[in-house]
Amino acid sequence: MKTTVTKLLATVAAASTIFGMSTLPAFAAEGKSASNGNSVNISDVNATAETRALFDKLKNSGKGDLRFGQQHATDENISSSASQGDVYETTGKYPAVFGWDAGLALRGAEKPGSGADKNANAKALAQNITDADSKGAIVTLSAHWCNPGTGKDFNDTTAVASELLPGGKYSGTFNKELDAIAATAQRAKRSDGTLIPIIFRPLHENNGSWFWWGATHASASEYKELYRYIVDYLRDVKDVHNLLYAYSPGGVFNGDSTDYLATYPGDQWVDVLGYDEYDSDDSADDSSAWINTVVKDMKMVSDQASQRGKIVALTEFGRSGDRKFKESGTGDKDTKFFSELAEALAENVPSTAYMMTWANFGGGGDNFQAYTSWKGSDGEADFKAFADSNKNLMASKDNVDYSNAPAAAMQNGSARIVTPVDGNRVTDTKVVVRVKTEGVKYSDLDLNSAIVTTDRGQNVKLKYSCNGYFTGILDLNAAGINLDQSKLTLTPQVKTKDGKTLAAADGNGSVTVKLGAKPEQTVDNVEDFDSYDNEAELQSVYSPSHSTKSNLTLVDSPEDNGTKAGNIHYDFVSYPEYNGFQRSHTPKQDWSGFSKLNMFLKADGSDHKFVVQVNAGGVTFEAYPKIDGTDGHVVSLNFGDADGNGGDFAPASWDTAHAGMKLSQKLLSKVGSFALYINDNGGNRPKSGDLTLDSIKLDGKRDAYAPNTNPTPGNTAKAQSVDDFSGYSDDAAAQSAWGNRGHTEVLSLDEGPTDGSKALRFKYDFSNGGWYDVAKYLDGANWSGESVLAFQVKGDGSGNAIGLQIGTSDGKYFLASVKLDFTGWKQIEIPLVDNANLTQSWPEDANKDNPMTEDDLASIKELVFASQQWNSESDGLDSSIADIKVEPAENTSNEQTPKDESKTEVKADKEQEQSEDTSADVTAQDPATCPISDEDSKGSTGNTTVTVKPTPDTKEPADNTGKDGLSRTGSNIISAIAAVAVLLLGGCAVLIARKRKGGDIE
């Protein structure tokens, strides 16, 4: 009886949260807090019963409960016979956690996605989630989203984070990505209609600098606000209640939580505290040193999770780089790696819920990727022993038993400024201020109390709009405030009807902005350290690598000129081997008009290895100034001549793919990052010390590099064979070489067009969509001066097409198509430069559909062949390709099968078809049109927001409300409470009809 009454009261309370805002609950059953065993501190208090049960199960993990997971557990594999993945083939079991990347799958770049139809891809991904659940596996989704501002890939680090927030230039574009996530989650159901809980891990490894949401591309404040926006949008606007949200920076933190928490969005938006770390050092025979590092950091993460009532997980791990599993399957060190890691976590961090490794994508050469053992590999037996060591490691019915659902703990009401973002610049005299409330019912808010105050005495009146937002406009002109490079601090104040002021979501709730555009800095001024007001600003620009932010500080310049300098503190005890800091440049900078790099250096005499690193044209170059003295002096590092000859820079020793390359002016025209490292030189040298640097500048002016888009005749380029297939002994060898996209099951060797020659056969039935691709990694091949890509194709007369894509090292893809309206062998020659039939298909930026230029030929990453279903009545294609080569202009016929523009299927994200206005503002809608989520969150079982655990004498989940739950009691008290509910709601009841926001993918 008590349970039923509590549920109905909760329903009444939820129903009283009326009009104009979405799910902002602030209460739990009988006021239970996160510390109470009967409730969980979950980010979504309206989460489905199954989602709360999963949270509880994972949070309460103890010794023996560790689960093993893998990305693409069943749909990528190394062994050709592993139809259900290598893990299943070697162990007879599925991993307990399955992972996919929603960002890639939904745009068709990874399985189960195929093609550009996000609607179809959402259905396919949801079906895979359902299948994983039926196998006894928990599902986690990451999101390698394209850069919404440029349309380029996730590693395009053009800063965009603040423009994705409400009112931002690309908020509408980003919302489409979130809509697809919502569509996937809401379709992921069991056969009885139960929504399957999913762990969603957006914006991962943000403390690195390789993603657009990463360090130096998004400030800590921007990152936190963007993460919160993702959760708010999915949970409150899209009404998705079967997601747990994971936060997962990458290591190493040396057990210190400072940097780990620097971008933590807050407990109201996070459920899983994760950690990503890979072992890439192959010098040791065992993995103990790396495991000790992981354990030290995981203890820190576990402590933080315990304090907050959250889940702890090793969200990504594996062996990569030099330590990766070898393509041959032999010669790997420490094949007991998985058992050793699992045992260390179980013993030292028993609360770890799961550890997930990456996908067995395969491929060949340097691009080979395997993260588990496979059939026939040296580690097969040890991996099977690992899988058999504990039943909880692998999938099972119990693993996905979500019958025991605790209540959601009460959340404290809060208010925060969403825009402008703390630390950002304001360049418009009319500033739109958006304040978001969380954890409080609309009916409890004092709408007339909402204001934002400034530290100059202004009060900005806020008006409630929808989705929990208040908005107002600060008119700087009217306030007499100039855009003069000064600062302005804003503080929100929102009260409830009982006079209480909502707490700040972060710190004291204030945000400080800079007034006016950032002063332009000339390209030759690489770094003078004088533009930073404080160390936090400096540390937001430079990303630590195997160090901590606090080891980069501002000091007085050793040049004694009254200016600032930068000080790098190294600590090889805490961070062994190397410490460093990197600054990325987006867009890339053109340094080609200068011949040297100067800097003022005051070293500590340690004689360690000082590394000055420049990434130019996608290649990492290094120079090594001596630091064996202590006197301050100017260091001058030469770039060499136009071709890089005679310079001080050489490719990094670990970048074997570019060994011997010179730092030419052409490469210097595209500088993507600049970094400073101190490497441990061993011996009796000190384990800690400091370097002070200032006045890092480009010098030695010269004519800048000018691309030659029209090469002169008679260039010295020679024909290059891309692949004649003669070197492959069997199908497996050919599949390995052409495995850069997976999908190798469609490939086999065939007889070539001439006696004794070989070809690559591509036979495919369109079962995974019209576009299905294979690729060979070309490792930055230089095609400069080449005129034609030539190859032979055997047609099948199907009327379909073979699509060819040339991928460059800077992320561009150029597409041409060969229509298979013929049979037998045919010579195809595709002009490479200024060819209207070979045009940029990706990214979908301003250069889309433009032809290749000579400049694009300098570094070729991969060659792609793909099926294109041009004939809808056919059931597949069967074609072969032979003798692929590039040739200079002479002796080429310059003929190409015409491209059928009407049928070309480009593997690109068609959701990027943007109108002129790509912005959106979920805060600016009419309250009457906002989604109203004030009724019970229905989930799969009609659960309310405030359920309690089942009592020991019943097997029914305690959250089965609705008709069945109410009818079982037969008590008159239910009628009485229902009557009270009607009185409480009064005339407002008519307003509780839910209105859903349009734009869902159905």
UniProtKB/Swiss-Prot annotation:
Activity-pH dependence: Optimum pH is 5.3. Retains over 90% of its activity in the pH range of 5 to 6.
Annotated EC: 3.2.1.78
Locations listed in the record: Secreted, Cell wall
GO MF terms, alphabetically ordered: cellulase activity; mannan binding; mannan endo-1,4-beta-mannosidase activity
One GO term describing the cellular component: extracellular region
Compositional bias annotation for Basic and acidic residues: 897-913, 952-966
Alphabetically ordered keywords of this record: Carbohydrate metabolism, Cell wall, Glycosidase, Hydrolase, Peptidoglycan-anchor, Polysaccharide degradation, Repeat, Secreted, Signal
Record-linked Pfam families: CBM_11, Glyco_hydro_26
Annotated PROSITE patterns: GH26 (PS51764), GRAM_POS_ANCHORING (PS50847)
GO BP, sorted A to Z: cellulose catabolic process; galactomannan metabolic process; glucomannan metabolic process; mannan catabolic process
Membrane topology term: Peptidoglycan-anchor
Polar residues: bias regions: 707-719
Residue span(s) of the pro-peptide: 970-1002
UniProt family annotation: Belongs to the glycosyl hydrolase 26 family.
Full protein name: Mannan endo-1,4-beta-mannosidase
Organism: Bifidobacterium adolescentis (strain ATCC 15703 / DSM 20083 / NCTC 11814 / E194a)
